[in-house]
Curated annotation (Swiss-Prot):
K(+) 2 binds at D246, T248, A287, A290, G292. Induction: Repressed by STM4068. Does not show significant conformational changes upon substrate binding. 5-amino-1-(beta-D-ribosyl)imidazole binds at D16, G31, Y101, R162, D252. This is Aminoimidazole riboside kinase.
Length: 319
């Protein structure tokens, strides 16, 4: 099934070194934005990646991964003077992960407003706070969001907060606020809400992004699914149960499934959002069943099989 409107993804792409056995690692493509783009394209969506990589082995490897998965790389720039990002994924026994960055800043932080393509009405633009950590990528993300809204398109901002990547964490609140004000939809995790607001419980901070100017918030709750907050109310969407191997990229797969579904229509309403979140929950669940952020990102037949074999509880109105 082909998406009707193009999804533009800007930001990070990296080579992830994932533990395989003692003293050995799997070389896996990754990066939050790259994962989102590949997920959209694998599902049959039309997706373009806006970014910068080093003209090195890692950069050429990642560009080939994009091409192999059907992602448009017309606006992906390779620069011989820069080094592509490489990181080690540290996994716990239950599949939870943390990251050790071997290259920072990576080439992805050098994407600039000059790299942006022209946008069209009803298209989508995705960015996350990872793209806001350094200049000129920060300006590229914010300007891209502004131009997409000006063109009559939509913007999805994923908070995806990684404080260790910031040189000055005091910049975070203002940049999150600017991003939320530009966004049609904001996606945030429960933990991130607590980090941003200082609240002990995410429920007490669930309106944080709405209060910054974004009317639609999706809070990812891991194994508990997702909470949608709109002007119509609050709705909880349970997630399917799976055996967890590696949680790397689960949130990105969630966003990819969400964007793919939303891009199939010119306008979105509650019914389409509900379908999109159900698909997003399924994509996120599938992503954690194998090592590597992209390994288990589904193709359409795999997603359909998963949906038919996992009974998803109906969304529950919370408020």
């Amino acid at each position: 099934m082909k998406a009707m409107n193009k999804v533009w993804v800007i930001g990070d792409a990296s080579v992830d070194l994932v533990p395989e056995k003692q003293n050995s690692y799997l070389k896996c493509p990754g990066g939050a934005s790259a994962n989102v783009g590949v997920c959209v394209a694998r599902l049959g969506g039309e997706c373009g990646f806006i970014g910068c990589l080093g003209d090195d082995d890692a950069g050429r490897f990642l560009r080939q991964v994009f091409q192999d998965n059907g992602v448009d790389v017309t606006f992906l720039r390779l620069d011989a003077d820069l080094t592509s990002a490489v990181l080690i994924v540290n996994l716990t026994a239950d599949g939870e992960r943390s990251f050790t960055y071997l290259v920072h800043p990576g080439a992805d932080t050098y994407v600039s407003p000059q790299d942006l393509p022209p946008f069209r009405q009803y298209e989508w633009f995705y960015f996350s706070s990872i793209g806001l950590t350094d200049r000129p990528a920060r300006e590229a993300c914010l300007e891209g969001a502004r131009r997409m809204r000006e063109a009559g398109g939509y913007v999805l901002f994923d908070v995806n907060l990684r404080s260790k990547m910031w040189g000055n964490t005091d910049e975070i609140p203002e940049l999150i606020a600017r991003s939320a004000a530009l966004a049609s939809i904001c996606k945030v995790s429960a933990d991130e809400l607590c980090q941003l607001s200082g609240a002990s419980h995410w429920q007490d901070a669930r309106y944080y992004l709405r209060d910054l100017g974004c009317d639609t918030t999706i809070i990812s709750l891991g194994a508990d699914g997702a909470l949608l907050i709109t002007a119509e109310g609050e709705f909880h969407f349970p997630a399917p149960r799976v055996d967890v191997v590696d949680t790397t990229g689960a949130g990105d797969a969630f966003v990819g499934g969400l964007l793919f579904t939303l891009s199939r229509a010119n306008c979105w309403d509650h019914a389409l959002l509900a379908e999109a979140i159900s698909n997003a929950n399924a994509c996120g669940a599938m992503a954690v069943t194998a090592k590597g952020a992209m390994t288990a990102l589904p193709f359409p037949d795999q997603l359909n099989t998963f949906l038919s074999s996992h009974s998803l509880a109906q969304a529950m109105t919370v408020k």
